[in-house]
Amino acid sequence: MERTCLAVILAAGDSTRMKSSKSKVLHPVAGRPMIAHVVEAVASAGISSVALVVGRDAGEVAKAASIDGVGIEAYLQQQRLGTGHAVLAAREAIAKGYDDILVTYGDVPLQTNGPLKAARQGLAEGSDVVVIGFHTDRPTGYGRLLVKDGELIAIREEKDASDAERAVTWCNSGLMAINGRKALDLLSRIGNANAKGEFYLTDLVEIARSLGGRVTAVDAPEIEMTGCNNRAELAVIERFWQERRRREMMLAGVTMIAPETVFLSYDTVIGQDALIEPNVVFGPGAVIDSGAVIHAFSHIEGAHVSEGATVGPFARLRPGADLAMGSKVGNFCEVKNGRIGVGAKVNHLTYIGDAVVGAGSNIGAGTITCNYDGVNKSETVIGENAFIGSNSSLVAPVTIGDGAYIASGSVITVDVPADALALGRARQEIKPGRATLLRQRALAIKAAKKAEA
């Protein structure tokens, strides 16, 4: 029978070191609040029940933590009296009788499911408490994990450690798993007879051992256990998240010419054999199919780029942009809520908004779909194999038929039938010699102003 598990995520801190008007767990990593990354890691470890301990910005934190497939109940910690006290804020959830209780933190967004699963496996093998630790060459400031005969005998804080204990490089991450059937009893035994008068979760190690229980530790990569307390640490976490995800994508068959200059979001999807040139930013909701090419300095969010399509350089795809196979959106173009058909070309200096561009159509440089009248947005529909001349303005709502031609510089306000030629501009006039007169007049005005000065 599969073991049941409750994850208790501690997210009630005051976030004072973040110097922010909002809780630190709401700050984004890869376009997503860091608390959501933690819930995702918990879910990927097979845990579908979460007790979220909140304090500051409780409603916003609970909302940010919500992801599909995970049941979350929020519990308010009224006072900040230590980690042991924080876990007991979720007493009601713990009392429901889970096999495993996993305690983690909302400001550790790089954690993955491996150490979480390992901690649960330790419980399944008979431990009452399993602490997740990490090895580091910079152990100063961390509690050391002291192990004897395969069991964790203590977590020694640095100020209390001997010289030999300070030499230990296996450190406490703060994350741990607890036997769910004994959790409330163990937690209720934590005292606050210390300098700060707080209840420390780490005391569970000695409490469980004093009751004859087995306590063990499992290892996690140091970077996965990195917590976030300020903006500098947030930047470090973002960098490592990006490096890890880029590597995963490249190993899956995505080419990144200068990966350190490519920035991904938490949900970016890029298919095999896609090519990503330098200095590309993917906002949330970007899907790039196999074989697509994203040229340098492009920004893509909420958009889909099909196989064989080309974007950029210096292009922007906004939410709702959908490029069909073999289509092209070139330099200094922006597409928002626009569908670009198979083989269609939007090559330069163009805005396509709330529009459909049919297969094989060509949109000339400087074309604008005028989709907004200051109050409402309207749609432009361009048929297949149409040709839109440069510097044209298509004032929505308007439809351009299949195979139609729009003369350069036109302002189109009326539907154009299929295979028709439309011109919407003033007729050109030529007046011989008039340029000389205009020039002489301008020079005379300039001379008069100079004389007055």
Swiss-Prot record:
Entry keyword Ubl conjugation: no
Q: For the region Linker, what residue ranges are annotated? A: 232-252
One GO molecular function term of this record is:
glucosamine-1-phosphate N-acetyltransferase activity
The entry's keywords: Acyltransferase, Cell shape, Cell wall biogenesis/degradation, Cytoplasm, Magnesium, Metal-binding, Multifunctional enzyme, Nucleotidyltransferase, Peptidoglycan synthesis, Repeat, Transferase
Cofactor(s) needed by this chain: Mg(2+)
Give its E.C. classification number.
Answer: 2.7.7.23, 2.3.1.157
Give the matching Gene3D superfamilies. Answer: Hexapeptide repeat proteins, Spore Coat Polysaccharide Biosynthesis Protein SpsA, Chain A
State the reactions this protein catalyses: alpha-D-glucosamine 1-phosphate + acetyl-CoA = N-acetyl-alpha-D-glucosamine 1-phosphate + CoA + H(+); N-acetyl-alpha-D-glucosamine 1-phosphate + UTP + H(+) = UDP-N-acetyl-alpha-D-glucosamine + diphosphate
Pathway info: Nucleotide-sugar biosynthesis; UDP-N-acetyl-alpha-D-glucosamine biosynthesis; N-acetyl-alpha-D-glucosamine 1-phosphate from alpha-D-glucosamine 6-phosphate (route II): step 2/2; Nucleotide-sugar biosynthesis; UDP-N-acetyl-alpha-D-glucosamine biosynthesis; UDP-N-acetyl-alpha-D-glucosamine from N-acetyl-alpha-D-glucosamine 1-phosphate: step 1/1; Bacterial outer membrane biogenesis; LPS lipid A biosynthesis
Q: Could you name the domain of life of the organism this protein comes from?
A: Bacteria
The answer on whether this UniProt entry bears the keyword Acyltransferase reads yes
Known PROSITE patterns for this protein?
HEXAPEP_TRANSFERASES
Positions of acetyl-CoA binding? 365, 371-372, 390, 408, 425
Q: Which family does it belong to?
A: In the N-terminal section; belongs to the N-acetylglucosamine-1-phosphate uridyltransferase family.
Q: How does it assemble?
A: Homotrimer.
Q: What is the designated name of this protein?
A: Bifunctional protein GlmU
Q: Which organism is it from?
A: Rhizobium etli (strain ATCC 51251 / DSM 11541 / JCM 21823 / NBRC 15573 / CFN 42)
